[in-house]
Amino acid sequence: MFFESYTEKVWGRQPKEISAAWGAQRIKGLSIRKVLIDMVKKLSRLNSSSATISQKGTETSLIERFLYPKLGPGQMWEEVANDLRAQGVNIHLRHNVKKLQFDQGTNKVISAEIWDDTSFTTQRRDYDYFISTMPISELIESFEGPVPEELPTAIQDIARKLPYRDFITVGLLLNQLQGPKGEELDDTWIYIQESDVKVGRLQIFNNWSPYLVADASKYWVGLEYFCNKGDSLWNLDDSQMIELAKREMDRLGLSRYDDCIDATVLREEKTYPAYFDSYQDFDKLSAAFNALPNLFLIGRNGMHKYNNQDHSMLSGFRAAELIAANKLDQSSKSSLWEINVEQEY
């Protein structure tokens, strides 16, 4: 299998140990026949003057063109935040939800205990609706006091035991970057199938947007490593991770060891919600959360779903639509879980 080595790097498991739901979600209805049809369509578009960014009807796995903010995806959310503030919306940054409290009569969440990282104080606030993007394993631990009967201990245990994979990015600033045969690399990202290196994927930030790199004669790349917090890879210090990344770029023939002129390391926990262990009972968990009228789970970690960024955003739109229409019943909320099961964009 072409992606076998990469899959093992990402999940730390052999593909046969992972739920088929993950593979089905990633490749959707892809087949050799559909790949060939897509190739013919692309050849036709090359000879057409009407080619646009629109790719309606294209298989999800075969999307090749997309819009990208010139300063990265965070730029879009900064603009959204500025627009909201201009409309009088308060956005509290550096605040962490620590506890959620239920009303036993309605099964609604009624208040949140919030830690303010700027003032080092705790506040309790009441809200009408709660939209969560935090990992479900952390959300379940935030419930304070008696919880609704829809969340018995067995259901809570499913949430607590949900598996995740953690993530390390090593950024290298390089004098030179090229393919193994000396060719120019125009990819935005490259999957690394080789089993003799630990890196799983390479991002070339120059190719995402030239505005992300101060000096156009240099190359910023990100080597992505998948691990679990506390394992041997996670426990390497930053200097050791940088050393590993430089050696592996050299081994792959993408740059020489001495081409690196600067480096940085970023670590992120629970980057990938995993599809094994207690995930096999996830349907019971999602049904239980659907029974809590004013609590909506969205996003990759919020739904424990390996969404792309666009599908994560769509889940937020769908939650807002349900709230605006006062559709808080289980049946209506179940529509959130139908996002990212379609075969096409």
Residue ranges with predicted function:
Residues 1-102, 110, 115-118, 126:
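Active-site/ligand-binding neighborhood in enzyme catalytic cores
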Residues 1-3, 16-18, 152-159, 254-262:
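Short, surface-exposed acidic
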Residues 9, 83, 138, 142, ...:
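Active-site catalytic microenvironments for nucleophilic, acid-base chemistry
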Residues 69, 93-239, 243-255, 281, ...:
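Mid-domain catalytic core of redox enzymes
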Residues 90-92, 261-264, 296:
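General small-molecule cofactor/ligand-binding pocket signal
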Residues 266, 276-345:
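C-terminal lid/capping helical subdomain adjacent to the catalytic/cofactor pocket in oxidative enzymes
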